């Protein structure tokens, strides 16, 4: 890439952005203005953002007109360090013509690994088993104790079949699954690469032994998984969500787990985040993680560099590597 034609200022919204990303920006002429608050303070951001050329948004607080107004008319671009952008007011960016980037794609392998971990942990009752140990309540003399669901010979269903779902499906090719099915608005042309079958939403619910949610949160998908959906699933099924908590009606999920409508759930995302320690979801058959699907050193650095390169491309008048619109 060519160097930017002049020095430019970049607001970094979080002090823990990967060092290689900061070094890349600085090597190309950026003055980095780093917010120091953890969690990020909106007041600090609003104080430091006026006059910057770019914003590197590395957290999930709302990114909207208030931030853009505070930045000023000289703002040239913004990139989030995230795959999902449900916290961004995209129409506001489009109205103003401000380039917006994000970091999908590079997260797929880390999230896929974690999703399979959740399938196993929830399907085999890891959390409940650990709880029994802590209570000295092992029941190994009971044949049906901790009876779980295994991946072998199971129907694996995906809601959404983009990069993350396909990375999971690729990993499952050697797990002797019965079949892989998925639901999206239209069939994916490359689904044959994963021996996957496009099905209706109802068929996905009815046939899946493991149902993995890996789709964006939109008005169409919000609370797509509710009581009506859970009632169509097998009683032995395992529900896994690595997308966004908002795709699930958590009250209905709690009821489905309490009533035995489904067997278990593995969640890396919830609403809200952090999930309160007194949440009823923590008292039913679950394996819940604190939204850590991308939390590996390799993936975090890759996300950081991609966000930085999105900004550099826009500053240099080139298309962003991963534009959000």
What are these regions (language model features)?
Residues 98, 104-155, 167-170, 175:
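Phosphate-binding beta-alpha-beta segment of Rossmann-like dinucleotide-binding domains, i.e.
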Residues 46-50, 68, 72, 151, ...:
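A short, aliphatic-rich alpha-helical micro-motif
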Residues 5-6, 27, 144-235:
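Rossmann-like dinucleotide/phosphate-binding beta-alpha-beta segment
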Residues 12, 56-57, 80, 212-213, ...:
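Redox-cofactor binding/interface segments in oxidoreductases and associated redox assembly factors
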Residues 21-27, 88-95, 187-194, 276-283:
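Short loop/helix-cap segments at secondary-structure boundaries that form the rim of catalytic
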Residues 2-101, 226:
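An N-terminal-biased, well-structured beta-alpha scaffold segment characteristic
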Residues 59-60, 83, 209, 215-217, ...:
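Short glycine-/small-residue-rich Rossmann-like dinucleotide-binding loops
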Residues 100, 173, 227, 236-238, ...:
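Rossmann-like dinucleotide-binding domain for NAD(H)/NADP(H)
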């Amino acid at each position: 890439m060519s160097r930017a034609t002049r020095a430019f200022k970049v607001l970094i919204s979080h002090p823990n952005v990967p060092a290689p990303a900061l070094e890349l920006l600085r090597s190309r002429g950026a003055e980095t203005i780093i917010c120091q608050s953890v969690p990020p303070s909106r007041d600090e951001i609003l104080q430091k953002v006026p006059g910057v050329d770019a914003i590197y948004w590395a957290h999930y607080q709302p990114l909207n007109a208030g931030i853009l107004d505070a930045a000023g008319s000289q703002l040239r671009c913004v990139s989030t360090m995230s795959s999902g952008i449900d916290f961004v007011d995209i129409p506001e960016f489009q109205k103003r013509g401000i380039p917006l980037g994000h970091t999908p794609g590079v997260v797929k392998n880390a999230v896929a690994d974690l999703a399979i971990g959740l399938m196993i942990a929830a399907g085999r009752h890891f959390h409940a088993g650990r709880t029994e140990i802590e209570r000295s309540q092992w029941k190994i003399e009971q044949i049906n104790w901790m009876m779980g669901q295994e991946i072998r010979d199971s129907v694996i269903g995906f809601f959404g079949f983009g990069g993350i779902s396909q990375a999971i499906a690729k990993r499952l090719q050697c797990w002797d699954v019965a079949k892989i099915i998925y639901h999206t608005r239209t069939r994916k042309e490359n689904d044959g690469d994963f021996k996957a079958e496009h099905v209706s939403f109802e068929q996905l619910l009815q046939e899946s032994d493991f149902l993995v949610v890996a789709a964006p949160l939109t008005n169409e998908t919000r609370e797509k998984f509710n009581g009506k959906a859970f009632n169509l699933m097998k009683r032995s099924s395992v529900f896994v969500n690595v997308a966004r908590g908002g795709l699930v009606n958590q009250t209905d999920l709690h009821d489905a787990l309490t009533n035995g409508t489904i067997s278990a759930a593995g969640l890396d995302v919830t609403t809200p985040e952090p999930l309160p320690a007194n949440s009823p979801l923590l008292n039913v058959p679950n394996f819940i993680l604190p939204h850590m699907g991308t939390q590996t050193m390799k993936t975090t650095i890759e996300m950081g560099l991609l966000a930085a390169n999105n900004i550099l491309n826009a500053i240099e008048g080139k298309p962003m590597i991963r534009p959000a619109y």
